Structures are given as C-alpha cells and as structure tokens.
Amino acid sequence: LNTDAVVTLNDVKVHYPVKEGALQRVTGHVKAVDGVDLSIARGKTLGLVGESGCGKTTLGRVIAALVAPTGGDIWMDLSAQQQLDVNRLRDLSESEMSTTDRDLWKQLTLNNRLGSMSKEKQRQFRRNCQVVFQDAFSSLNPRQLVRDIVGRPLRVHEQLSGEELDRRVIELLEKVGLGAEHLLRFPHQFSGGQRQRISIARALALNPEFVILDEPTSALDVSVQAQILNLLVELQAEMGLTYLFITHDLGVVQHMADDIAVMYLGQIVEYGPTDQVFDNPLHPYSRVLRDSNPTLEGERNRDWELSGTVPNPIDPPHGCRLHPRCPVAAAACGWSVSDALSRTEENSPVLFETIKTIERVDDFNAQVAFDNEDGARAFVDQLTNSSMNNAMPIPPTVSGSSVTLAFNEVKDASLEQIQKDRWSSCIRSQENGLLPELVKTPQVNEKEGQ
C-alpha cells in the first residue's frame, strides 16, 4: 500500500440470521458479505461489480454506516503508514503488543475505526461520506420541495436558514445542471435524470470527500446515463471526490473506474486496475462478466459461460465459491458432498427423488442410500462423467443400493496477489499466475440416460 485510503475494510462480514419454527430458532445465516478486504484510494474511483444478489449494495451500506457489520473492521482516512500499522497490529492479542503498540492501537481505533470513534468523529464521518441511491424517486421525499430536500443537510450540519440557505441550494443545483427555477418544485415534477441530479446535489451539500454511488444510472435511459456519468466525472475533477461506484454494468465501470473489485456470493473474487482486469481477467467470473458485455465491435467470444444457478448463500460452496458453475473448475477447486447432491437435483430431478437417506460424516464424506441399486448406479455414472470426478481420491462405490462418497478436503479460497497490483481468489490462477485456457470437450448430457 503506497497511498492514503479513504476507506479500508478488514475481513468485513454481514450475516443475517435465518429463523424458523414457532420459537424462531436460528437455523443458519445468510452470508450477504463474507470476509471482504478492500481499500479505496483517496481521489480515485473504485468500481464494485457483480450480479444482483452478490452483496455489493449491502457492502456499500455497511461502508456508509447504514448497516452494522457482524464482523471485521472498517477504517476511515488511514495513511499508507497507518494501513501498515493496522495490518500488523490487528491480529495481535493485547499481551503480544508492546506498550507503544497498545497506545498506537488505541489511538487508531478511537480516531479511525468505524464503530469505535468518538461522537465528534462520527459526526465528521457523516459529513464526509454521502450516498447517491439507485432509485432517486424513492430516495427523495415526495412531500418536500427541492429547496427542503437539498437544504436539509445544510440546516442540520451548518444551521443555515433563510436567504443564505436558498443561495447555497441554488449554487448546488447549478453545479449539477439545474437552477433557481427548480427550487420550489416537488420530485414528481422532474424527469428521472433530473431527480438523480437532485440526489447528487443533496449528496454534495456538505462538500464530502467520499461518495458512494449505488447504481446511480441503472434506472435511466442510455442518453441520460451518459449525461449523469459525465457530470460525475466533472464533479470529481472539480472537487477531488473519491467514488465507490456500485453497478452490474461493466461498460459504465470501464468508463468511470480506476480500479475494479469483482464480487460474487459475498466475497471479492478479483481486484485490480480497470484496464488490466478488462484486458486480462484472472478469475473465470470476471471473464464471463466481461464477455457478456457488448462492445462496439459486437459481442465477445461467449465460449466462457456459467452453468447452473447461484448457490445458496446460507451454505456457500467450499473452496472457490464459483466452482460448481465454473467452465474451468478442477479437482483442487473444492468439491464436496453438497455439490454432488445439488448437481443431481438440478440435472436429474427424477433420480434425486429416489434418494432415501443421506448420512454425512462431514462436508466431504457421506453415505447416500437410494430406493434401489439401479438408482445408486445411475448416480455413480453421473458423478464419473462430471467435472468433480477427479476430486474424489476414492471413486464412488456402490454397495447394494448405497453409494459411498469421499472428496478431498480443501480450504476456502482467499484473495491472493498474483501479479503486480492484481489479486484473485481463483485457485487455478493462483497456481499458474494466469487464468487457465478453456478446453472445449464434448459434454455428456447428464439429463439423458436417466
């Protein structure tokens, strides 16, 4: 780390409890954000991309202190040296710290850690971090005039009123391409693009350093999107703003962002400079997202495609979380008993219905009993012809109407540096330094032969 960071995240988690039954017992947790490490450099734009439901909006709300994390730390305004100090001290127990270290840690937590700051520091954070939401119409009070909407932060934090307040509001409106004639109108009297400009004006009212943009253009027409994006670029250059730009549109990120963080199933799977991630993705998910984005030359090669559906965030896959859907998944990527069962349920629902019992030893070993021996043999044939076959040190064996499963136990994939300024959680990229080539082989149709 060689630059100051507006925001630094260490192992941030947001887990929502799942409650069932009359007594509402907790039976599991939805891992919306699961162990995110991230740093946003001052004056830069970080693009946070991923499919709907990957956790990117939740992560943005956590950074804005609108949602409390269930684990990890969020640090504000750390210098490069302070980031090094935090990384060194955060895993030490108090007994392992020297007196100097303890004093430094106390100072860092009181001044820079969200949740431990003094009230004055929290108030300062509220001023310096603002959010522009996706749906401008629902984020603007329909009963208030533009003057009241944009002027509220000025009344609360700077205690302005009267002509001075109106003058500041008009200045903000003019900054975003509106004017005094819009001061006494309600939100419903504006177009979608104009409402988003009002949201931006409100976010800029207190001269923040950091703005979180949560899909600010996704609800707008393409021509209006371009106007808003150009406005955001101009404002950043004029005011020295730092942006976290959350979107599912890679074309927008390519235009806006200095760096990209790709998010899948609650985790960051790739991070790096925008041009490098587009030119040479180091994670299969990034490659699929990039290739699905149309260009002026037409669509890219679509050989890289994901299979199946997004796994359950209550029980995410072991190893690399993409491996059940990945076109280049290998034995080391983290197959488990749950993968074998979910693959069968998805591709052979009739066969899945013949399963009588499942006796799990652990996540990687189990005994699966079927109604008859034919079902057990069909299950083994399906596993043998699938990409998870090489992940089993002992081939699945049939004993009567039961099948014994044994997979290699693997640890969960983590984000690791692969190249200069490039990080990826792809296990195969970590082994080779590059994304593996896609080898197209004739695929066995698992639905046939049921």
Enumerate the predicted regions with their spans.
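P-loop NTP-binding/switch modules centered on Walker-like glycine-rich loops
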Residues: A65, P216, L220, V224-R302
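Conserved ABC ATPase signature
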Residues: F186-F190, Q194
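Conserved ABC transporter NBD signature motif
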Residues: G72-V86, D91, T99-N112
